[in-house]
């Protein structure tokens, strides 16, 4: 009897883990101002940037030099150069990824991501659709309360003096 109860319980658990709420929500691809073929993106981007920007990958924590960057300037999408974050809104979240408390309005788009079995808000470049990272509600309370947790490889930094880093 214990074995039968265990099998029923396990079966119920496995079926519930495969419910529609656990599946990645498929939304139609948006049309973006900058569009390229997969081959063009591969030729333009490093393998790491291609994985993150075009396949919604995640770089390893603490692997990006931009995480510790303290210079004044603008962070742009590594795919198309659209300005997405300003350095004056960057903060050290301790997570190992560059973090900001706000975006440059109109240049970042948001969607729902359920890939890990729970809902997260995903951030994309509004110009090319490149995956940037995710936004969470555990940022600095004295500002927006948001933490835009961004893959450094999805960004390029333009210092105030205009030279690309």
Kindly give the residue locations of the regions a language model identified.
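Alpha-helical interaction segments
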Residues: 7, 30-32, 39-40, 87-90
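A short Gly-Trp-Pro
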Residues: 42-76, 82-165
């Amino acid at each position: 009897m214990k074995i039968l109860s265990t099998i029923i319980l396990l079966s119920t658990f496995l079926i519930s883990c495969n419910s529609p709420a656990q599946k990645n929500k498929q939304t139609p691809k948006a049309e973006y101002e900058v569009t390229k073929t997969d081959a063009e993106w591969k030729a333009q981007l490093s393998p790491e940037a291609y994985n993150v920007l075009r396949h919604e990958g995640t770089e390893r924590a603490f692997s990006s030099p931009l995480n510790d960057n303290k210079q004044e300037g603008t962070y742009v999408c590594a795919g198309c150069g659209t300005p997405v974050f300003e350095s004056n809104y960057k903060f050290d979240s301790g997570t190992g990824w560059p973090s900001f408390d706000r975006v440059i309005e109109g240049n970042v788009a948001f969607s729902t991501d359920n890939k890990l079995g729970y809902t997260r808000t995903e951030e994309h470049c509004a110009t090319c659709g490149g995956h940037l990272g995710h936004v969470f509600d555990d940022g600095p309370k004295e500002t927006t309360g948001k933490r835009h947790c961004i893959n450094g490889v999805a960004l390029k930094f333009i210092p105030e003096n205009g030279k690309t880093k």
